[in-house]
């Protein structure tokens, strides 16, 4: 039985909204699916707006969090906040409970356009965060000098322009925005197989999805490698450091290891959130079209919209200064996220205090401070090694010792003989000048 579109085509504002014929081939999904989807999207929207709203409030009101690197987190939180507000609750939630898109064709295009902008913005902002953290870990001594508020602002402007570039194409005929899945939300048209739609999908996949994936993988792979190398260097230096320096080095290594674990979580969350969309779009273009059912098309929507919840948890709650700020302002938020005392102590030990006279543009992040402290200790050890031998030490003359010295077979085998008593304590070596005579004794008489 074909799908009854009377409950899924909108008759408000614009009755000519386009529904791709592909979706007519499937039966209408049960009401329970609509209601479950509406509840899920509503919960994601409310939590996404609340969580990202708290992140934006704290990062803008807490001076210690207003560093250049944290501008990316604020931009990500703003992107996810808007994504949850417009593309989740209430538009899609209302449509799911009514079992049809009720907001018309123009609203469908605006909905898809906003979803495209902030979807691409979240992906590219995560790539910018990975670049910043790669600079902090891979080049810690130069990280605080290179990243400033101006540089971070320029990178964020690039992210916005990049996102608008890919989202605006369907508005002007390069692809299209249309209903998808259970016909309660709008997105890119990935079902049509004409050349315009296919080129749009391929370009978005390669440059809008796969490109940021390569950036994120490259940066976090090098972060993990840097963590491994620093741990080996710290182990080699441990014996030469005093107790205070060793404690700071161990704290920095612990902070690095936590950062590496967070990096793995970030990559996994990124793939979990956005890979299903990419797979379904490519499958619709190059695979069996009958595999793209309403259920298969709606699952990526759920994963992508849930990413607005993951991001503030991963990028913000893992930040030690953010945890401190949120515990003072909203202590109830962290009741489910307990951090042991050792982790908090390591974070404090690993951070370097910023002098009051420094400009806020050059203020390093906590990660940069940790790495600068470790690199300073490593440079100190390298300077000590470079200062040996001491200045003024004359090297031995060329050709010394002479070739063939000592002679082969020297000392002779069995020398000294077994049982040979050692010389008495204080005895002068053979050939040494005679000792001075006691006080009051004539030297010639003493030697005679």
Swiss-Prot record:
Protein name as catalogued: Rhodopsin
Modified residues (N6-(retinylidene)lysine): 305
Disulfide bond sites: 108-186
GO biological process: phototransduction; visual perception
Bilayer topology term: Multi-pass membrane protein
Function: Photoreceptor required for image-forming vision at low light intensity. Light-induced isomerization of 11-cis to all-trans retinal triggers a conformational change that activates signaling via G-proteins. Signaling mediates the activation of phospholipase C. Subsequent receptor phosphorylation mediates displacement of the bound G-protein alpha subunit by arrestin and terminates signaling.
Entries under PROSITE patterns matching the protein: G_PROTEIN_RECEP_F1_1, G_PROTEIN_RECEP_F1_2, OPSIN
